[in-house]
C-alpha cells in the first residue's frame, strides 16, 4: 500500500527517509555524500513521484521504492 507521504508529520517523514538512507549502505562513487544530501535526494524523488513510500503488510514495515517496482 502506498503511503501518502505529504500527510505525514515532517519529523516522521525525515526519520523514515533517514532510516532508509542508512539501510542502503555505503556509496562507492567518486565523492561521498552527507546524510543530509542523501535525505534531500530522496525527498526530491518523493516530490517528483519517482519513488513512493510503501507499507508492507506482510513484513509490517515501511520502505521507499521506485514507483515502477511497486505492485499492489
From Swiss-Prot:
InterPro entries: UPF0270, YehU-like_sf
Family annotation (Pfam families): UPF0270
Superkingdom as given in the UniProt entry: Bacteria
Gene3D superfamilies in the cross-refs: YehU-like
Family indicated by similarity: Belongs to the UPF0270 family.
NCBIfam families noted in UniProt: PRK04966.1
Protein name (database record): UPF0270 protein ETA_31870
Organism in which the protein naturally occurs: Erwinia tasmaniensis (strain DSM 17950 / CFBP 7177 / CIP 109463 / NCPPB 4357 / Et1/99)
Amino acid at each position: 500500500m502506498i503511503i501518502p507521504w505529504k500527510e505525514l508529520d515532517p519529523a516522521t517523514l525525515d526519520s523514515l527517509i533517514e532510516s532508509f538512507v542508512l539501510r542502503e549502505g555505503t556509496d562507492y562513487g567518486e565523492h561521498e555524500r552527507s546524510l543530509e544530501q542523501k535525505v534531500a535526494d530522496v525527498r526530491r524523488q518523493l516530490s517528483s513521484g519517482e519513488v513512493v513510500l510503501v507499507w508492507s503488510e506482510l513484513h509490517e514495515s515501511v520502505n521507499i521504492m521506485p514507483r515502477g517496482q511497486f505492485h499492489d
